[in-house]
Amino acid sequence: MDLNFDLYMNDVVEQARNEIEHAGYHQLTSAEDVDQVLQQKGTSLVMVNSVCGCAGGIARPAAAHALHYDKLPQRLVTVFAGQDKEATQQAREYFEGYAPSSPSFALIKDGKITEMIERHQIEGHDVMDVINQLQALFDKYCEER
């Protein structure tokens, strides 16, 4: 029975990874990957992915559809909570002042957190609410592309 559950979870994780990658986000799977991207000048949107229902039903669709906008971050990246633990922990080092939360979004500018959309701002909200929150961050911190 455990084997079937593990196979099922592997499929769920793979689907979640593919969905966010297809939307244009680059997966960061190590602490070094995280530092290499987040220490760069400019803006990076970090999506902290997870297998929970609000990630699949709200956060990932919002992550994809929010990109249909004039102002965008220079880099789109994702870490996977519970899967790529080292990368997720390293990303959270940049989220100063925020508790660990997944799914979530963090906008990093010049290596520093600007603002974060936490799980409580995603769970129980609809996709358009989260898209609007993301695009408000883009308006505030990003340039037209």
From Swiss-Prot:
Organism for this UniProt entry: Staphylococcus epidermidis (strain ATCC 35984 / DSM 28319 / BCRC 17069 / CCUG 31568 / BM 3577 / RP62A)
Gene Ontology terms: biological process: cell redox homeostasis
Matches recorded under InterPro entries: BrxB/BrxA (IPR009474)
Highest taxon in the source lineage: Bacteria
Protein name: Bacilliredoxin SERP1075
Pfam families: Disulph_isomer
Classification of source organism: Bacteria, Bacillati, Bacillota, Bacilli, Bacillales
Homology family: Belongs to the bacilliredoxin family.
